[in-house]
Amino acid sequence: MAYDFSVSGQHYLFNVQTFAHTVLALGGDSYNYAFRDRTTQGVIDDVASGESELGVVFETSATAADLDAAFDAAGLEFVQLAESAPRVALPASHPLVNASSLTLEQLADYPYIYFDQGKDAPAAFFEEALGDQPCAKSIATTDRASLSELIVALNGYTVTSGILVGISDGAQLRTVPLDADVTLRLGYLKKKGAQPDGTAARFVATLEKNLERYAKF
């Protein structure tokens, strides 16, 4: 099925909210859009093939070189819109939830929940900052709802983008700054030389506004 506008993105709530804001702002009696949660490779593939016009992703100061090379090889370019610092998402009842900041060492005894990228995915493709660090307890999942439920049920944690819109997930989760020397760069993928227009341009403008509003350091 052909869509009037389609976006693919990593598993972030600010993607969903930006898409919803765009649809509401445009209105109309009829429309045919698509929003796709994907792995990092899935986002790349969707934009490269034209399945989606844009792909919302992030890279870090540590992964930028590898990701930019992968984007370039696929005929894509990354447009940075904002920067943020990583934060740890924990259950509201977690014993470390009131810390002023946390290190990965302090979290070593707790299950680490993350998004599965596939067994052959490069470390740079993880959706969590410092996702390549070894953990004694880790669980991979493929959707946002399962990730949130597992964090709460197992008293676990994940590392978020630092964009706090929607992260509370019904007040079950809280975030604490992660003590790490890494910066997150958030933006979108497009085909080289392409310029978003129409609905895509509205989406990008709304995305930039949301990122600037909710980014935390």
Language model features: what each stretch is:
Residues 2-65:
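Central regulatory/effector-binding core of bacterial HTH transcription factors
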Residues 5-11, 111-117, 190:
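Short beta-strand->loop
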Residues 15-21, 64, 108-132:
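Secondary-structure junction motif
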Residues 26, 174-217:
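A late-sequence structural motif
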Residues 39, 48-53, 58, 118-174:
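Hydrophobic hinge/microswitch elements
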Residues 44, 48, 78, 104, ...:
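Short hydrophobic/charged patches on amphipathic alpha-helices used for structural packing
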Residues 71-73, 77-86, 90-112:
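Flexible hinge/capping segments at coil-to-helix
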Residues 73-79, 84, 149-194:
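Beta-alpha-beta core module
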